[in-house]
Amino acid sequence: IYARLKGNGSKPPIVLMHHMDVVPADPKLWKVPPLSGAVKDGVVWGRGSLDNKGAGIFQLLTLLALKRQNIQLKGDVIFLGTADEEALDHTSGG
């Protein structure tokens, strides 16, 4: 996933990068279904909820806030979600 907010070019760009892939999970080892995103005791449980979906959501919300508030950027802000970190198959070009 890629999105870019353009700045005026007076500063270098910044990349907000996260990975979207997850490691395999054995449902027998989980107290909730690993793909459920279940909320238990005020915490979201599920594959990727900590590594790295949370960071991706924070980055997306940052990008949206910058856009909605019409912040005048000195450099581009690039939002990048990759899909090869867990597999160590670094072929996404990032």
Which ranges hold each PLM region?
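Acidic/His- and Gly-rich active-site-bordering loop/insert found
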Residues: 1-47, 66-73
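Acidic/histidine-rich catalytic neighborhood of metal-dependent amide-processing enzymes
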Residues: 50-94
